[in-house]
């Protein structure tokens, strides 16, 4: 199956919504209001089938800080799983992160083996170290304090804040150093 990986457009949001719905019904992805998808469409890339133009996968790269971003909402249509579409899409997100100058990529996932193939490692509970950083992602205390001001749930999940733990669905937090 041949697909083209490209930036998402507003006309793709309905297809992205459908992909998310499939995964959120199964408790794999958190549901997002459609308005949030439109607001963040510039963060998304999609995989489009070359033979019929159908969007069969999506993924987003959300920048959290100067050197930190999150891979979000990576979803592949069931009919396309096992064909490397998700891997190609993730590689495009990582390429985008490199281009932006982001050095660390975070994800919250059930798909630990998939992300591990790309170099992601599981991270544990955040703890402050003697040098003023927060393990395991090594965030300086001043940056941590700034990130606490964010209203973004993904930032709260990365920081492992108590208020979002019920929403993380038992996912693993993973980190990649580029």
Where are these regions (language model features)?
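Short amphipathic alpha-helix that is part of the acyltransferase structural core
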Residues: 1-31, 48-49, 54, 150, ...
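Conserved acetyl-CoA-binding loop-helix of GNAT-fold acetyltransferases
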Residues: 82-95, 107
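Terminal substrate-recognition subdomain of acyl/acetyltransferases
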Residues: 98-99, 106, 110-178
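A generic "binding-loop/recognition-motif" signal
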Residues: 12, 67, 110-111
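Conserved glycine-rich acetyl-CoA-binding loop
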Residues: 54, 77-88, 100, 117
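A conserved beta-strand-loop-helix scaffold within acyl/acetyltransferase catalytic domains
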Residues: 31-45, 49-50, 57-76
């Amino acid at each position: 199956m041949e697909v083209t990986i490209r930036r998402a457009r507003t006309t793709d949001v309905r297809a992205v919504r459908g992909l998310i719905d499939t995964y959120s019904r199964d408790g794999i992805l958190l549901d997002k209001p459609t308005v949030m998808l439109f607001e963040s469409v510039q963060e998304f890339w999609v995989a489009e089938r070359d033979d019929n133009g159908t969007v069969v996968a999506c993924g987003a790269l959300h920048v959290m800080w100067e050197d930190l971003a999150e891979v979000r909402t990576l979803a592949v249509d069931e009919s396309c799983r096992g064909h490397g579409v998700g891997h190609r899409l993730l590689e495009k997100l990582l390429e985008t992160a490199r281009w932006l100058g982001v050095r660390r990529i975070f994800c919250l996932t059930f798909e630990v083996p998939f992300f591990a193939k790309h170099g992601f490692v599981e991270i544990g509970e955040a703890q402050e170290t003697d040098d003023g950083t927060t393990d395991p992602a090594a965030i300086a205390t001043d940056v941590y304090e700034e990130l606490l001001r964010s209203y973004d749930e993904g930032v709260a999940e990365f920081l492992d804040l108590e208020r979002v733990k019920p929403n993380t669905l038992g996912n693993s937090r993973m980190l990649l150093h580029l």
